[in-house]
């Protein structure tokens, strides 16, 4: 894609959500990495990618200046004027609105202002200059929620809505002059002026009337409407709309007949939020499949669950096929995962009782997320249509010789409700699966030899690392499951029962963005845990690489006079097999206790060998077994502690890279790019006087979360997908 042609100036790092770009060099780098072709708004070709770039990443879209576009806009305006000159009665232009459409007026301009007045009813923070009386209660109280973020829409939603509304109006079906559209683009998009819009008040029936009334009021320079602007220090501040217009030398709009109605009557806010949600959901779906592949590696699973026969031949649902292909590709080259092509037939007599297949959270991952991928794709198609549609009423056909006026209900935003509720259900399914994968990962009864709570240190009795995350995951997953409930089943009759059915699309879209926040947190915790688990696997592998030499040397030292070298190698293989199994089974205990049990079990191999000798070997071999156990425990513990120190002294060294498949890029992104280290150094040192100097676990998880929410991680994921 071509570089962005126009980029907005940086704006304030505010506590409010949804601002465009933070001022730090890091944040500017992240924003500039989101590239899109120049967005040209013509009413027919707006893409979700362009909407997101314009809403969140400072891209400045331009209006299509072509003669054809200008002509259809001008023709619709002239058709409307001609009908009014003939004295025709036209809804919303010389009649009342909605259930009051039986009223009539000849003052068409005043009617447009009455519409704005009627709809500007949302609850916002009270500015200090507002003319109010003295408070009757205590003058100060701490708020229960953040007043700004709980009452004011994020700027990204508003910018997106302005882009969508311009796309609709540029189609020439609404009777709104080019001059109005041009000023909208210049004031709001080019000069980065964002109206302050209430979060609540829309039922998305006759479109998002109330939110759009604040946009229209700002364009008209209403003193009671506020806007976010960038001051001389680069900070985002609120000023009145008339002041915002003065700052940028833009004359406020005086609305002609139907123009205020044309700005208000549409699904722009619902479509904006749906578009932003769709983009995030697509990326989170890819991330969920990536963390699933990493979980397969961390749990020593198999790519056989994603074999083409299962998905492409036996049950060819498109989402399932897509997911299995992606996960299988991510596991390519992994030394931790088992591979279908290397699968061995195991005889019943050789089967030692291990799981013959992965558990459901891995084995059925593609069947679980596949339908959600299809739903997200369907939602994307709906949003693509919506942001290139006319959602006004009445509508003017500029190609009809008489400029026929159509009365309909394109503002009923149920298509957006349906889209975001499908997305939300898909997000819930992904979150539930990821949560269960993580509970399996931290549980020593299920994780195939990883230590309890993913503690990387030898003494688990002083390291409960992942336990808090396990609890936090349950909390946020529960919240996500609640958000999965539909909004559309809670419709209330409104506006004198005229709007007896209403889509609630914006409300549902808001819930979907909350669900996106929850799943983003779940994935941030998951990436943190998975990288820790992969480092521990690498630690275990490095220890395991040294054990054959250690065991063979110890057998030679203690039992060389009773067994030749060939027998020593044979016994060593049996001892190592026994040790591997027992170490997996005791991963909830401190290292020394594990090793004592492990060598106790392994000594049965030696007892059996000596008991089968013709002479029994005498008493010396039995005494040597006791010595062998004690020496083995001490020597193995020494190796384990040395390797642990080596790993924790270099917590950013990406110890597991050589073991991973294509997931290596994500693992190294967390360790190197984000600077999130392997955990455990403070536990290894038993918290010796340095506790106050360490970053919290949550602090590091927050770094991963931030990279998801600002899109930096998605850039990495996009590059990874391109390289598969």
Curated annotation (Swiss-Prot):
Q: Where does (E)-cinnamate bind?
A: 265, 357, 363, 393, 467, 495, 498
EC number annotated for this UniProt entry: 4.3.1.24
- 2,3-didehydroalanine (Ser) carried by residues: 206
Location in the cell: Cytoplasm
- A Pfam family this chain is assigned to: Lyase_aromatic
The active site consists of 91 (proton donor/acceptor)
Q: Where is this cross-link: 5-imidazolinone (Ala-Gly)?
A: 205-207
Post-translation changes: Contains an active site 4-methylidene-imidazol-5-one (MIO), which is formed autocatalytically by cyclization and dehydration of residues Ala-Ser-Gly.
Annotated GO molecular function terms are: ammonia-lyase activity; phenylalanine ammonia-lyase activity
**Which InterPro entries does the record cross-reference, listed alphabetically?**
Aromatic_Lyase (IPR001106), Fumarase/histidase_N (IPR024083), L-Aspartase-like (IPR008948), Phe/His_NH3-lyase_AS (IPR022313), Phe_NH3-lyase (IPR005922), Phe_NH3-lyase_shielding_dom_sf (IPR023144)
- Give the record's GO biological process terms: cinnamic acid biosynthetic process; L-phenylalanine catabolic process
The UniProt entry's GO CC annotations, sorted and at most eight, read: cytoplasm
Chief location: cytoplasm
Pathway per its UniProt entry is:
Phenylpropanoid metabolism; trans-cinnamate biosynthesis; trans-cinnamate from L-phenylalanine: step 1/1
Q: Which top EC class is named for this enzyme in its record?
A: lyase
Question: Which family does the record assign?
Answer: Belongs to the PAL/histidase family.
What role does this protein play? Catalyzes the non-oxidative deamination of L-phenylalanine to form trans-cinnamic acid and a free ammonium ion. Facilitates the commitment step in phenylpropanoid pathways that produce secondary metabolites such as lignins, coumarins and flavonoids.
- Recorded protein name is Phenylalanine ammonia-lyase
Ranked from the top, the taxonomy reads: Eukaryota, Fungi, Dikarya, Basidiomycota, Ustilaginomycotina
